[in-house]
């Protein structure tokens, strides 16, 4: 640890590190969203599907995020629960143009919310209704209705329409998540 790191820590200037789980079905845009939140010089040019999980980092104005980008492929979703205890917040990404798999996304969300490591914690959940740029995309209101988000009463949650490739809607979501993390004890 360098002198500046120590000094900033002593002065309370060092950013608080937060562990965030990034979940959602495969091809929903999880990795693209996390990549877009990193500084432009740290972004990957080629995004490939995540196998298992990867750890990514990005910073907001007051927090340092360590994101566990979890594979959304069916055979890897059982790995999600091994990281629930570590998570201080959740980003759940939905492909708003994939109407056929909205039921699967809803089932995975219910499984997540009912898991013992999540169920009794007031953990903030940010939903990105991604791929809003596509012609057949559902609105974030419709996605919210299909996933029955209004039934989530014991956790703060927010849904943002997003276009991960252009970066639209991402900052709004991160700002909300940052506010929640700073005000909610998980």
From Swiss-Prot:
One of its GO terms (molecular function) is phospholipid binding. InterPro entries: Arl6, P-loop_NTPase, Small_GTP-bd, Small_GTPase_ARF, Small_GTPase_ARF/SAR. GTP binds at residues 24-31, 69-73, 130-133. Belongs to the small GTPase superfamily. Arf family. This is ADP-ribosylation factor-like protein 6. A lipid is attached at residue 2 (N-myristoyl glycine). It is found in: Cell projection, Cilium membrane; Cytoplasm, Cytoskeleton, Cilium axoneme; Cytoplasm, Cytoskeleton, Cilium basal body. GO terms for biological process: brain development; cilium assembly; fat cell differentiation; intracellular protein transport; protein localization to cilium; protein localization to non-motile cilium; protein polymerization; protein targeting to membrane. Interacts with SEC61B, ARL6IP1, ARL6IP2, ARL6IP3, ARL6IP4 ARL6IP5 and ARL6IP6. Interacts (GTP-bound form) with the BBSome a complex that contains BBS1, BBS2, BBS4, BBS5, BBS7, BBS8/TTC8, BBS9 and BBIP10. Interacts (GTP-free form) with IFT27. Involved in membrane protein trafficking at the base of the ciliary organelle. Mediates recruitment onto plasma membrane of the BBSome complex which would constitute a coat complex required for sorting of specific membrane proteins to the primary cilia. Together with the BBSome complex and LTZL1, controls SMO ciliary trafficking and contributes to the sonic hedgehog (SHH) pathway regulation. May regulate cilia assembly and disassembly and subsequent ciliary signaling events such as the Wnt signaling cascade. Isoform 2 may be required for proper retinal function and organization. It comes from Bos taurus.
